[in-house]
């Protein structure tokens, strides 16, 4: 059986899928609170930058992969309007349910779909914009997922990948202390789950750096790939176009 990484552990691919699912079933109910605590609210600025770069317009078709609690889907639905089509998707039922309920509470009615990014159930050349925020690092076959995202994009459509990345070297030691000491403490204190937030720190370290992810997107067939470092490289937004 093929091996892969779950944080720093080496596990079978099927076991990773189960473990990742377990993490997000566990954190779903506290996801928004923990995002605010862990990032000091910065995740809102990172998402706002992504929304601005996506430049969704009335009538656009948008696929929000790993949509979680629906921050991007909410913004895109407002911009795409009644003539547009925004799909809020996630592979995790608990996250999808929390996101769906949150969108409804905000008065946003948009399709919600349980979706594996490695097997996207849409035809070729369908979407104007595809986004994945803080989801790619949890995927087992990132290359397959990126290829699928490209497949469903229309010509001239764009893929935006917002993800934790490699922090600038002068901040690395402090960031390591925060990641491996503070994050698990916050998880234990506010969500009664230190292990899930320890996995978060480990999964960030195992994720490809900015240049490697840029190359992966190019190898998936995307063109004009560029990235923006946010908060000293704690997060990066990669953007690629299908020509």
Curated annotation (Swiss-Prot):
S-adenosyl-L-methionine binds at residues 69, 90, 116-117. One of its GO terms (biological process) is menaquinone biosynthetic process. The keyword Transferase applies. GO terms for molecular function: 2-methoxy-6-polyprenyl-1,4-benzoquinol methyltransferase activity; demethylmenaquinone methyltransferase activity. Keywords: Menaquinone biosynthesis, Methyltransferase, S-adenosyl-L-methionine, Transferase, Ubiquinone biosynthesis. Methyltransferase required for the conversion of demethylmenaquinol (DMKH2) to menaquinol (MKH2) and the conversion of 2-polyprenyl-6-methoxy-1,4-benzoquinol (DDMQH2) to 2-polyprenyl-3-methyl-6-methoxy-1,4-benzoquinol (DMQH2). PANTHER family: 2-METHOXY-6-POLYPRENYL-1,4-BENZOQUINOL METHYLASE, MITOCHONDRIAL, METHYLTRANSFERASE. This is Ubiquinone/menaquinone biosynthesis C-methyltransferase UbiE. The gene is ubiE.
């Amino acid at each position: 059986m093929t091996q892969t990484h779950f944080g720093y552990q080496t596990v079978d691919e099927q076991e990773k899928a189960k473990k990742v699912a377990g993490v997000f079933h566990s954190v779903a109910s506290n996801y928004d609170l923990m995002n605010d605590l862990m990032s000091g609210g910065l995740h809102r600025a990172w998402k706002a930058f992504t929304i601005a770069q996506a430049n969704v317009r009335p009538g656009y078709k948008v696929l929000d992969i790993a949509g979680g609690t629906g921050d991007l889907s909410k913004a895109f639905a407002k911009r795409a309007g009644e003539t547009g089509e925004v799909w809020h998707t996630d592979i995790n039922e608990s996250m999808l349910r929390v996101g769906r309920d949150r969108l409804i509470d905000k008065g946003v009615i948009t399709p919600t779909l349980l979706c594996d990014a490695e097997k996207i159930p849409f035809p070729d050349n369908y979407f104007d914009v595809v986004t994945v925020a803080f989801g790619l690092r949890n995927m087992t076959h990132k290359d397959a997922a990126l290829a699928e995202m490209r497949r469903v994009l229309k010509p001239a459509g764009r893929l935006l990948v917002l993800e934790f990345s490699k922090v600038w070297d002068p901040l690395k030691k402090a960031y390591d202390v925060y990641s491996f000491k503070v994050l698990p403490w916050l998880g234990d204190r506010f969500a009664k789950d230190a292990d899930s937030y320890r996995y978060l720190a480990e999964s960030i370290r195992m994720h490809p750096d900015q240049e490697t992810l840029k190359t992966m997107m190019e190898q998936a067939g995307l063109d004009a790939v560029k990235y923006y470092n946010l908060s000293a490289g704690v997060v990066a937004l990669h953007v690629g176009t299908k020509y």
